[in-house]
Amino acid sequence: MSSKRKVELCDSLLTWMQTFQVSGPCSSYEDLTGGVAIAQVLNRIDPSWFNEAWLVRVKKDTTENWRLKVSNLKRILQSVLEYYQDVLGHPVSDDHIPDVALIGEFSNDTELRKMVQLVLGCAISCDKKEEHIQQIMTLGESVQQAVMESIQELLSKAPSDAVTSESFINYDSQSRKYYFLSEDNDEKNEILQRCHDLEQQVSLLMEEKKNMMGENRTLKEQQEQSGMGTPQLFNKKLLLLQSQIEQLQEENYRLESSRDDYRQRCQELDRDVQELQQRNQDLTGLAHESQALRDEMDVLRHSSDRVGKLESLVDSYKKKLEDLGDLRRQVKLLEERNTMYMQRTFQLEEDLHKANASRGQVESLSRQVQELHKKHSTESLRAEKWQFEFQTLKEKFEALQKERERLIAERDSLRETNDELRCSHLQQTCLGQADLLLSGSSPPLENLAAEIVPAELRETVIRLQQENKMLCAQEASYHERLCDLQNFLEESNRSKNRLESESRLQQQQIKGLKAQVEELQKQLREQGNRAEDSSQLKRKLEEHLEMLHDAHSELQKKREYIETLEPKADLNMSRKVDELQQILHQKEEDMRAMEERYKRYVDKARTVIKSLDPKQQNYIPPEIQALKNQLQEKDTRIRHLETDYEKTKVQRDQEEKLIISAWYNMGMALHQKSTDEKTQPPNGAQSFLAQQRLATNARRGQISRSHTLLPRYTDKRQSLS
C-alpha cells in the first residue's frame, strides 16, 4: 500500500471517529495518541463492557507525558482484546495488534491506524452494529470506501468464530502476553476471579455427581423391591436402568475427566498466577529501575551534550590561545611607553589651565572667521558682478573699435576724394583766372567754369562736405566715448585689483585664524583629556577591559573585525583625501580660468592701447605688471599648498595606522595575559569552577594594573598628531 493511500485511510478513519462527537479532542491523529477520545468512542459503542468505571481509569491530562499515553493505550488495548475474545467470540491476529509504545512516544500513524481499525471492528460487531453501519453509510463515498477497506483488512486475517481449545489457548497466551504489558493490578484480580469461578464449577459438578450416585442407589433399591414383579416388566426396567446407569456412568466419567481437567487447569492457573505475581514484582522493580535509568540517561545525555559544547569551546580557546603570543610582547611595549607618557601628563595638566583661558579667544576668532567668510562671499559676488559688467563693456568696446576702424577707412577714402575735388576745383579756378586776365570779362568766364563743372559732381561735392562734417562730429563723439570707456576700464581694473588683493588678504587671514583655531582646539582636547580625573579613567579602562573579556569568547571574530576596521579607516581617509583633492582641483581650475580671463583682458587692453597710441608699443602698464605678479604669487602659493597637503596626508595616514595598531595590540595583549593566567593555575590541576574563580581574580588584578595604559595611549596619539 502506498503512503498516499495510507494517509487517505487514516484521514477517513479520523472522519469516522469524529462522527461520535465525543468531548475529548479528536481533530487530528495527534489528539488520538493520548487515548482519551478512543476510550470515549468505545464507551459509546458498548457502554455495558466499556463502562464508566473503566472510562474513569483512563488518564486525561497526557499532553506532556508520553508514558501516561502509553499506559492509557495499553489499558484500552487490553479491554478491546478481551472484548473481541469474550463478547465477539473470536480473537485478534497478531498482525492487527498495534504497538502502543510507538503510538504514545512517536505518534506512529500506522500503529494508530491499527488501533482505530480495532475500534471499527468493535463497532460493526457489537449489538448496535446496524446503527453504526447506518452512520457509516451517511458519510461520503471516499470515506465509506476507505472504511470498508479497513473492515476487509481487519476481517481478512481474523480466525473462525468457533471457540475451540486452540483459540482458548491462543487467547490465554495472548492474555498472558499483554498482561506483562499492563501495569495495573485489576487484570490480576480478574484472572483470580476466573479461577475462583472454575473452582465453583468443579464443586457444583462434584455435588451433581453425588446426587447422581444417590439416585443410582435409590434406583437399585427400587429394582430390588420390584424384583418380585413380572419378568418382562422387570427386564424392561432393568434395561432402562442399565441404560440410565450407563448414561450416568458416562456422564460421571465425563464430569470426572472435566473435573480433572479443571483441577489441572486450576493448578496451572495457580502456578501461572504465582509466576505472574512474581514476575509482576520483578517487572515493577525493573520498571522502577528502568525509570531511574531513564532519568539517569536523560541526565547523561544532557551532560554529554554539554560536554560536547565544552569540548568545542575548549578547542576554540586553544585556537585563541595560540594567537595571543604577540599580544604579550605588545603589552610589555605599552607598559614601557606608559612610563614615558606619565612624565608628559604633568606638563599637559599645567597647559590645561592656560588653554582654559584661551577658549574665549577661540570663540571670538571663530566669530571673526564667520564674519570674514560672509565678507568674502559678498566680495566674491561683487567681483563676479564687476567681471560680468567688464565683459559686456569689453564686447561693446570691441564693437566700437570695429566701427571706428570702418569710419577711419571711410574717412581716408573721403579725404582722398576731397583732395581730388580740391585739386580739380583749384585747376578750374586757375584756368578761369587766366581766361579772365586774357579776356577781361570775368562774369562770362565764371559762368563758363560753372557750366564746365558737371551738376553731378557738384552734388557729390556738397554731399561729401556734409558727410565730412557729420563724420567729424561723429568722430569727436566716438573719441569722447572711447575716452570714457578707457577711464571706465581703468577704474574697473583698479576695482578688480583692489578686490583681488582684499580677497587674498582675507584668505590669508582666514587660513591664519583657522590654523590658530585648530591649534587651540588641539591644545584644548589634549589638555581636556589630561584633565580627566582618575575615576573617569578607571571607569573607561574597566569598560575597555570588560569589552576585552567579552572578546575572550569570540577572539577570531574580533581579529576579523580589526582587519575590517583598518580598511574602513583607510577608506574614510581616502574619501577625505579625494574630497580635498576635488576641492583643490576645482580651485586650480577656477584659478586657471581667472588667469585665462586676465590674460585675455590684458591682451585686449594691450591691443587697445597700441591702437590708440602706436608710439608706445613697448610700454607695459603697471596694472598688467601687477596682475602678472599676482598670478606668479598665486602659482607659487598653490605649489606650496600642494606640497604641504601631500606631507599632511602621508603623516595622517601613518598616525591613523599607528593608533589603530597600538589600541588593538594593547587589547589583545591584555586578553592574552588574562587567558594565560587562567590556563596556568599556580596550585596544579583544579576543577572548572576553581579555574573560573582564578580567572576572575586574575582579571580583576589585570584591571588594577592596566589603569596606566589609557594615558599612555592618549599621549602616544597626541605625539603622533
Swiss-Prot record:
Disulfide bridge partners, by residue number: none
Domain Calponin-homology (CH): 7-123
GO BP annotations listed: cytoplasmic microtubule organization; cytoskeleton-dependent intracellular transport; early endosome to late endosome transport; endosome organization; endosome to lysosome transport; lysosome organization; protein transport
Annotated stretches, region: Disordered: 696-721
A GO cellular-component term linked to this record: cytoplasm
UniProt keyword list: Coiled coil, Cytoplasm, Cytoskeleton, Microtubule, Protein transport, Transport
Pfam families for the chain: HOOK, HOOK_N
Ranges in a coiled coil: 181-425, 484-659
Location in or out of the cell: Cytoplasm, Cytoskeleton, Microtubule organizing center, Centrosome; Cytoplasm; Cytoplasm, Cytoskeleton
A GO term, aspect molecular function: dynein light intermediate chain binding
Subunit structure and binding partners: Interacts with microtubules.
Record function comment: May function to promote vesicle trafficking and/or fusion. May contribute to the establishment and maintenance of centrosome function.
Family the UniProt entry places it in: Belongs to the hook family.
Name the UniProt record assigns to this protein: Protein Hook homolog 2
Protein source organism: Xenopus laevis (African clawed frog)
Gene (UniProt): hook2
